[in-house]
């Protein structure tokens, strides 16, 4: 458990949307990410002390299709722009958690482009899970590969390849050293080989013992991922659902049951964890659109 997370009040921003970026990659670089600096007084007014930023790495479309792990998306600005934002946030006492998408990359990822060009002769063929030149795929590449949930624009990485692991760890080290980020939210954590998380945890602990690792987990036993050997925390989707549905149905047993099951003094199964509790995010509807009665908003935020 990282001590700072016990009192962390998070604000979540999806930068590509927040900054009004174009839908697709642009060659021209625009310093939109600096807009976050303007919001620092607003964050301080709400006593926010941790900012979770959705994808900032270079991508072709929505950010979860990474094309370069070591470069800020042109639509957001330059690495220097983002460093300026990070410095301002830290000066204001706000920690920074970035979205780390390590299960898959986009089709414009540099190593995958090399495979598309050189095919079997590419030195990066083993970087991608179950790459097979004996079959075609819906994109008509003349080969196939594993994806995230059947989306062929999201190419699954081979995290059992040491070269891939080293590349990712070195990329993470760059963001830790140059931008002093405080943690990572790990996308699609339930799809990732647990051995990678063990390596990641060891690497981060040695690099910065205060660095926080939080995984996106929707179903299952959270202890499977959040434990001393792997991640520090996971998303608490169980209580997220209970927070709004208990109010909508005027039946508070659901949230009471979840809280007691998770954190109750007599055997709460997650009582030793600090889970990432939330009322909405980029994958679900906004809370104000989910609750049936506007007056319940204040109650839900208070319970959070």
Set out the residue ranges of the language-model regions.
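Active-site-proximal helices and loops of the catalytic beta/alpha 8
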Residues: 92, 116, 177, 187-271
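Short, glycine/acidic-rich beta->alpha junctions
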Residues: 35, 77-81, 192-196, 293-297
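Substrate-binding/active-site clefts of carbohydrate-active enzymes
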Residues: 3-9, 14-49, 56-173, 178, ...
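Active-site groove signature of glycoside hydrolases
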Residues: 102-104, 153, 167-194, 272-281
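Active-site-proximal substrate-binding groove within the catalytic cores of carbohydrate-active enzymes
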Residues: 263-304
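Active-site beta-loop-alpha junctions enriched in small/polar residues
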Residues: 16, 56, 101-103, 189-191, ...
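Hydrophobic faces of well-ordered beta-strands that scaffold small-molecule active sites
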Residues: 9-12, 51-53, 96-98, 184, ...
């Amino acid at each position: 458990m990282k001590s700072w997370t016990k009192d962390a009040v998070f604000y979540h921003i999806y930068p590509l949307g927040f900054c009004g970026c174009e839908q697709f990659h642009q060659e021209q670089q625009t310093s939109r990410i600096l807009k976050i600096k303007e919001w620092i007084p607003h964050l301080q007014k709400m006593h926010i002390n941790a900012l979770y930023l959705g994808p900032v790495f270079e991508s072709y479309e929505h950010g979860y299709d990474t094309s370069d792990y070591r470069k800020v998306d042109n639509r957001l600005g330059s690495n220097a722009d983002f460093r300026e934002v990070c410095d301002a946030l830290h000066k204001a006492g706000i920690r920074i958690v970035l979205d780390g998408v390590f299960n898959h990359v986009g089709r414009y990822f540099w190593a995958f482009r090399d495979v598309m060009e050189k095919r079997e002769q590419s030195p990066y063929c083993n970087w991608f899970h179950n790459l097979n030149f004996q079959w075609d795929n819906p994109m008509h590449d003349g080969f196939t590969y594993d994806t995230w949930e059947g989306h062929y624009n999201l190419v699954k990485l081979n995290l059992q390849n040491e070269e891939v692991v080293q590349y990712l760890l070195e990329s993470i080290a760059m963001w830790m050293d140059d931008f002093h980020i405080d943690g990572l939210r790990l996308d699609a954590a339930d799809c990732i080989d647990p051995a990678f998380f063990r390596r990641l945890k060891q690497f981060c602990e040695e690099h910065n013992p205060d660095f926080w690792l939080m995984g996106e987990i929707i179903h299952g036993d959270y202890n499977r991922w959040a434990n001393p050997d792997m991640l520090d925390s996971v998303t608490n989707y169980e209580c997220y659902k209970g927070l709004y549905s208990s109010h909508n149905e005027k039946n508070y047993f659901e949230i009471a049951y979840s809280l007691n099951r998770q954190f109750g003094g007599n055997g709460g199964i997650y009582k030793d964890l600090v889970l990432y509790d939330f009322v909405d995010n980029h994958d679900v509807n906004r809370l104000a659109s989910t609750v049936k009665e506007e007056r319940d908003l204040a109650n839900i935020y208070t319970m959070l």
